[in-house]
Amino acid sequence: MYDLILLHPPSVFDFRAKRQFRGPIADVIPSTDQFDMYALGLTSIASYVEANGYRVRLVNVGRRMVAQPQYDPEAHLRRLRARVYGISLHWLPHAQGALALARLIKRLHPSSLVLMGGLSSTYFHEELIREPAVDLVLRGDSTEEPTRRLLASLRRGEALDSVPNLTWKRFDGQVVSNPQTYAPAAVDAFDLPAYAYMLRSVALHGHLDDLIPYEGWWRRPLTVLLNARGCVLECATCGGSASAYARLCGRASPAYRSPERLLDDLRTIRSFSRSPIFMVHDPRMGGGARLARLLDGLAAERMPNELVLELFWPADATFFERVAASVRRWSLQLTLDSHDEALRTGNGKFACSNAEVESTIEAAFAAGCRNIDVFFTVGVPGQTLASTLATADYCERLLERFGHLRRLRLFAAPIAPFLDPGSRAFEDPALGYRRLATTLADHESALLEADWGRTLTFHSDAMTRDEIVEATYALTERINDLNLRYGLSSAATHAAVVVGIGRARARDTAGAGPLDSAWMFAKDEMNWPGSEGIRPTLRLAWIIATGLVEELRLIASRALGRYDGRVADEGVAAPPRSAVVRSDAPAASTRRPSR
């Protein structure tokens, strides 16, 4: 019997029996429209509590349901017994799937406890705890240690009043919300993601099907370096903005991972893959000294993998020359949101002129950048249908200037299906959004709509839901034509997207489903050149061998009743904001409306 089984649900639990047109809600992410890619925190929780002696397992229920038509989640979960079942509700599009999974677990294992966690769970914890199938909710962005304390209290038969960040129900049904006091200032004690844990689990326990991050990952793995928890920017529509983290997690500034820990993650990734490594967050967050340590370390590693960097504001030739001197192959991802400088500034990222954007692109290519992906968004504050269509003209301008290189790729996607809870767009009506869903139950119901346009739970003062849908199709049509003209996509890919958009406009759901979910962009357009499958190395063998030694240690510790021997001590005081390099959010974007 396990102490904890962590579960990742699909977006809609019975999607295989439903006829839904999910549209382009997942076209620019690696996973399918069931959002079968689990949050990185699930692996760090599993790794941390296991290191402290507890038996834990992670099951990507959503991925297995997507990839394996014969997979029966009820039969599988009936066989897996645990004291606590932890269900991820981090991203709000999992609202229906997470709650349905909680109800299934409570029916199959009524004497076990159902735990919910993630940022969306944090926001809606008071509503979640009233759900009969939910016994516990852990709040915040770093619940590794609170989860361990919860399991320790249950093992010792103690009351749960001392577990930080916990909302729970007593046996008589009384709801208790313990103080939310745990927000570690540093997160080096946790593996984010816990690649070594995943590799050991697969090698020693054969849990490959349960642990694959999303469908297709095994063939073309994309790995991640997590720079920090939290952010320095105030992007209006982002539930991971500075004010959202302050509101939901009590975090005054990001908790950065040290360059040394990032480099250790990189070595682990190299042990099993030569595929691209994506760094989440702008690497300049945290200051120049931290950036220098990271780049110096990368130069010493001489890693063969391509590094994909995310930029939040313009960069100059000096920065790119440092990057080029540190890694052999590197690419960029830029989220511009809009060509309109005022709209872009109001939302948060790249609050600068278009000339500065183009100067950044030019400097990056001059320094040897392999590819640059530029993302535009439909539905940012103040954006009209006409403004969205004008973005296509700017895309053409970018390709006129850089298209001959065939290394600039342009994408567009709507804010869909929901506004992020805790974001300024969700909280502040002054930004011009009109919410059509307020409660978790509202969002759960919206996910059952037959068409993605009806699933949208908002419109703006500038665009109706129908206009957001049409703007998405129209902008993507233009980008698709530009990609063909400039040799960035094949005739077959162009034709497939034309057919997809035509079917979308006609609301033709024939063949719709999670394995056929790329309507606006063919999925092969999102693949990074050079992606390769898994490959064994001596370091991988060493990781597995040390994992076996660790497994024997854990077995002995459990037999002797010795638990909680590797407790993290990261502190809870947030570092001062002086560590922040800069925030390009305008003054109006720094308002932090109270919940």
Feature roles, as predicted:
Residues Y2-L7, L115, P259-N371, R401:
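Conserved SAM/AdoMet-binding glycine-rich loop
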Residues Y2-Q34:
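Short glycine-rich His-centered loop
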Residues D14-F15, F124, L233, Y245-A246, ...:
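Flexible glycine/acidic-rich beta-alpha junction loops that bind and position SAM and/or redox cofactors
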Residues R16-R19, K169-N227:
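N-terminal [4Fe-4S]-dependent radical SAM core
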Residues G41, Y48, R57-A186, P421:
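Glycine-rich beta-alpha loop elements in corrinoid/cobalamin-binding modules
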Residues H125-P132, G382-L398:
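Catalytic cores of alpha/beta
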